[in-house]
């Protein structure tokens, strides 16, 4: 991240918190299983920016539908309260590192990765 525009980081909530994480935001709609709030060390749980329950269930049942999930999630982020929550995340990034936390096992296809991509696209 040196010299360029700050970027959102993503990390599984089950991974140890580090100083480099900066502001830690859980972006899942549901609290992750088998982890306490103390262990998670989150600064904010932002349910409003998470995919809707319907979209989450649809994607969970069809991991091959990544591109369709991205498109549907982008539409959701254009509506309130998700739009305001996304704007708050972008504002926090201007103040320092922001790590988007998620619980999914798939490190490449999850809502935090989708959110990171969509926020980056909206900022460029």
Q: Residues of each region from the PLM?
A:
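Residues lining hydrophobic/aromatic ligand-binding pockets adjacent to catalytic sites
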Residues: 2-124
């Amino acid at each position: 991240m040196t010299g360029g525009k700050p970027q959102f980081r993503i990390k599984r909530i089950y991974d140890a918190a580090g100083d480099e994480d900066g502001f830690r935001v859980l972006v899942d709609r549901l609290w992750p299983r088998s982890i306490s709030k103390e262990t998670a060390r989150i600064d904010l749980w932002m349910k409003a920016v998470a995919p809707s329950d319907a979209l989450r269930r649809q994607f969970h049942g069809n991991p091959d539908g990544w591109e369709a999930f991205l498109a549907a999630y982008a539409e959701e982020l254009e509506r309130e309260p998700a739009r305001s929550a996304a704007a708050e995340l972008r504002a926090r990034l201007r103040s320092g590192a922001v790590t988007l936390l998620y619980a999914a096992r798939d490190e490449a296809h999850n809502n935090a990765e989708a959110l990171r991509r969509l926020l980056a696209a909206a900022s460029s």
